[in-house]
């Protein structure tokens, strides 16, 4: 059975292609199932990821107006209770902003559509803040986060396709800022402003990458064997059996990106 043609690209798929074209091929083009655990200890990490997803839902419910006391009753594990308490104590400067939780934006990108689902976008007077909630056990380095495709795509796509969130007016790159907020490190957010030069470089790079993917016939394995320890597809490539330890902050983020949204099944605000 032939896999359906790839129609959308996301921060996760493009990061996969940048990290290991072969993983991109197995995951998105051939759509193979994960044959291996992505990190150890498996059950503990799976529980942590599920709690992270649940925390996102709690925050979304609060942002759409459900009282914090009611939502907080659902924070029924030690991790969830701690993250929820840290969230409520955080001083997010968004009270006077229009809030758009769990919003999906898309725009054409070569033969594909570039799609991103945001945890939260807030807008006021043409100024836009992107919030992304992270529940990692260790805080990734800010300089490691800066070139990641999530950081680049979320800001660029908001500038390209965020008019609907700003009264049908464009949001200039200089008016965009992205914040990674770490639930276990609430006083250590990673903040990334933006400007027109960065936007142009990012969009040009995205167009080039989309064209490269569309024309690709060979998908090479990564030369960085350390990545393979955290890749659930490593069994297809004879790159080891034992999974890496997801307690490493940056490897944990990479493993988290393997649980991507199926953008063929979600609503979006399209440009």
Which role does the model predict for each range below?
Residues 1-121:
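Metal-dependent nuclease catalytic cores that hydrolyze phosphodiester bonds in DNA/RNA
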Residues 3, 118, 162, 226-229:
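Anion-coordinating catalytic cores for phosphoryl-, nucleotidyl-, and glycosidic chemistry
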Residues 7, 146-147, 171, 224, ...:
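Active-site-proximal structural scaffolding
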Residues 30, 63, 67, 135-138, ...:
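Hydrophobic/aromatic-lined pockets within catalytic cores
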Residues 42, 46, 141-145, 222:
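Short, solvent-exposed segments of well-ordered alpha helices
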Residues 60, 207-271:
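Accessory terminal regions of nucleic-acid processing enzymes
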Residues 83-84, 133, 181, 233:
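Tryptophan-centric aromatic hotspots in well-structured domains and transmembrane helices
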Residues 103-208:
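Mg2+/Mn2+-dependent nuclease catalytic core
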């Amino acid at each position: 059975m032939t896999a359906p043609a790839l129609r959308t690209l996301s921060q996760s798929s493009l990061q996969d292609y940048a990290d290991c074209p072969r993983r991109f091929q197995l995951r998105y083009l051939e759509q193979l199932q994960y044959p291996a655990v992505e990190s150890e200890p498996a059950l503990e990490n799976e529980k942590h990821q599920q709690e992270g997803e649940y925390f996102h839902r709690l925050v979304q419910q609060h942002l759409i107006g459900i009282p914090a006391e009611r939502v907080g009753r659902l924070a029924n594990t030690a991790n969830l209770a701690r993250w929820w308490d840290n969230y409520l104590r955080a001083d997010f400067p968004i009270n006077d902003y229009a809030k758009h939780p769990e919003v999906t934006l898309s725009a054409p990108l070569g033969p594909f559509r570039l799609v991103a689902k945001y945890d939260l976008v807030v807008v006021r007077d043409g100024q836009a803040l992107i919030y992304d909630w992270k529940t990692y056990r260790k805080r990734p380095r800010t300089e490691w986060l800066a070139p990641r495709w999530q950081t680049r795509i979320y800001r660029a796509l908001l500038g390209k396709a965020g008019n609907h969130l700003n009264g049908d007016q464009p949001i200039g790159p200089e008016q965009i800022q992205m914040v990674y907020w770490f639930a276990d490190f609430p006083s250590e957010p990673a903040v990334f402003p933006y400007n027109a030069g960065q936007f142009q470089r990012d969009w040009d790079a995205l167009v080039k990458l989309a064209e490269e993917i569309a024309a690709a016939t060979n998908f090479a394995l990564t030369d960085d064997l350390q990545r393979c320890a955290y890749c659930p597809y490593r069994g297809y490539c004879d790159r080891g059996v034992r999974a890496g330890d997801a307690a490493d902050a940056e490897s944990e983020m990479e493993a988290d990106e393997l649980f991507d949204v199926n953008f063929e099944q979600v609503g979006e605000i399209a440009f």
